[in-house]
Amino acid sequence: MWTALVLVWISSVPLSRSHTVPAVPRHLVTNKWPRAGKQNLSGDAVPRADNTSTLRAATVPPAPVTLTTGTWAATLNSTRVTAETTPHGTNTSTPTTREGTADSVTSRILAAPTSSSPSSVRQTLPTTIAGLPSLSTPRAEVPRTNASVSPRTAIATTVAPHTGTPTTGTVTAVSTVTPASGTVTAAVGTVTPAAGTVTAAVGTVTPAAGTVTAAVGTVTPAAVGTVTAAVGTVTSAAGTINTSDPHARTLSPAKSTPTNTSSRNPIPTSGAQTQGTTIQVTTDQPVHSTAGRPTPSPSNTTLEPNTPKSVASTSSAVVTTTQVQTKEPSASTVPVLPTSMSPEVEATSPTTQPSPLLPTQGTGGPGILLTTEQVGTKATAGTASAGPTSRSSGDVKVPTTASCQLSTQGQYLVVTTDPLTPSLVNKMFLLVVLIVGVTLFIAVLMMFALQAYESYKKKDYTQVDYLINGMYADSEM
């Protein structure tokens, strides 16, 4: 009789007031009838219209659950629950404990009211919970950070870590992937290729095993001095341009490594080459790109220097000999001022595609680097083979009816290595003028001194003579 009264009273109590959460949410504490869950009674669950059963949990001393894997630093304390269910009036109470996950099941689980602390439990768990093998074993899945290890689930209705970490969800560790050797690691503004191949970048290209380190505003070659280039260089894979048709110019892919043209363009050498020459190209006015316009040039015409000059004689001269070649693509038509014994400038056909790093060997001296942004010059060291210059077979035929000329806009400043003597001449002239002026000043002072001395002597003599004359005059009287 007492048991029936207790059952009726428990059924009438609202489910939301049957549990309370302590200040530290470690486990569930029931304030009414703590031993109600230990009674094996029939009809202690009320069937509902949706064919689900209402579960009630009794308190058991908390059992610590310690994770062996993952990154949780706190020990999760949970409460073991012995649930008794009676679906459709049948007592099938089966408490179980398992280590894996199971199929989802629909049930209504009695939970504690929500607390204000970040680690409190939710008032009502979702109706579909993954990790429950049957209706009699409600579980809460413990979050894990390692997805490769099978997650552990504890029989608990409250999971409250010591720290304020949320108890639901999946924490995925952000891993840093280090590329293997030979993989290009791209960053914003910098690209470092693996070996030798120059990869396009925004502002900076640094090859690992190449010969040029291109930075913003400065191109430093391997052996030949330092060349100040335009701000920014953007390069791409090397290629060839088909310029047989002036209206159709396409960039066809070729080798991905810079082409060495020292053996293809032999130039006779007649002296030592300048290795420390510095060429400075001003970029106050950007070079206008001639993309979309055919490059005018006489058909099958090659201009070569008539007489080779020495390095010293041509280091300060402006190169006027040009040659039109379109074997490698480039961005604009820019005459470059190399300092070699046989100066030669290659004016390449314009295109709007990014140009590759072309260390074209001219006459045993610096090469040319043309970009799509602004004028860029690059000097590379190389050895030119001795022999006559012959380029008639590789010349490109360009129609002579074009109305545009080679782009020569911009200001070019040639910096030579010869010593400048006008300053010394000016110093000598000023020194001579100073010496002459001081001499004249001293002479004038001496003249004034002599005149003053003579005047002083004459004054004394006049007084004596006056006295003598006066004496004689008085005596006569």
UniProtKB/Swiss-Prot annotation:
Alphabetical UniProt keywords: Cell membrane, Glycoprotein, Golgi apparatus, Membrane, Signal, Transmembrane, Transmembrane helix
Membrane disposition: Single-pass type I membrane protein
Signal peptide (UniProt feature, chain positions): 1-18
Residue stretches of biased makeup (Polar residues): 253-288, 298-309
Cytoplasmic side, ranges: 449-477
Disulfide bonds: none
Predominant place of localization: membrane
UniProt keyword annotation of Glycoprotein present: yes
A cellular component annotation (GO) from this entry: plasma membrane
Composition skew (Low complexity), residue ranges: 85-97, 310-326, 348-361, 378-393
Compartments in which it is found: Cell membrane; Golgi apparatus, trans-Golgi network membrane
Glycosylation sites: 40, 51, 77, 300
TM region positions: 428-448
Renumbered residue ranges of the record's region Disordered: 79-103, 239-366, 378-398
Protein name: Uncharacterized protein C11orf24 homolog
